[in-house]
Amino acid sequence: LVQGYRYWYGTSVLTSCEAALTYYRKVARVVEQDVNKGGSTVIQRVRLPDEAENPGSSLGLIDDDLIQYYQFLADKGDVQAQVGLGQLHYQGGRGVEQDHSRALGYFTQAANTGNANAMAFLGKMFLEGGPVVSQSNDTALKYFTMAADKGNAVGQSGLGLMYLHGKGVPKDYAKAFKYFLLAANQGWVDGQLQLGNMYYSGLGVSRDYKMAIKYYTLASQSGHVLAFYNLAQMHATGTGTVRSCNTAVEV
């Protein structure tokens, strides 16, 4: 990464976009592999009750007193607090340790009240499996379907993944595309990314690089790492767009 930076800005070497791109590609491929190993879907931004909606707020640590307050609300039956804490413990970060056991408990409480987001996250947990729940396509399908029936974008995207990969259901690219489109139309980043992939590969739809770029761009605006990687690759190779080394590096 440092070498790429040096060639891009001409630090102690002659400025060379192509050389910078070579180094950045190596790093990007490692990141892409790590993200793919980390799970099939992205995690929705955690929103706790009364939290400010500014995009940067998700980067900060959460005060212990605030966590205790949300735990108090969750214990009193506040569904939004239960879902928010479930997400925090599911993914970890912001000063909160990853704890899938607690995440499962909070999601289950909220799902039992009919909360679609909690149902969708239970679907994620069973689709991926782990130390707390055994992987179960049938259980994942049940929760994703319950969430999707309520119009939940995370549930719709989850169903899309199951049909895309034939997990618990016959592989069906047309149905996968349908559910990803429903999710993407609600602004859900994983639906946007998967639509980009389907247009890029021509799965369930005619190959269309312009549409792939459109959906990768939408997903990148929400910060999806794989969307940035795919966009950079397309600009670097001139796939569906005029080749631009500068744009590839900047992305």
Write out the residue ranges for each language-model feature.
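Canonical positions in the second alpha-helix
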Residues: 27, 71-73, 109-110, 146-147, ...
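Short coil/turn and helix-start
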Residues: 8-15, 57-61, 75, 93-98, ...
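Extended repeat-based solenoid scaffolds, especially LRR ectodomains
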Residues: 43-84, 89
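Structural signature of tandem alpha-helical TPR/SEL1-like repeats
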Residues: 14-23, 59-65, 96-106, 133-143, ...
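Hydrophobic face of amphipathic alpha-helices that form TPR/SEL1-like repeat modules
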Residues: 2-9, 84-92, 121-128, 158-165, ...
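Catalytic cores of eukaryotic secretory-pathway lumenal/extracellular enzymes that build
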Residues: 1-6, 21, 209, 220, ...
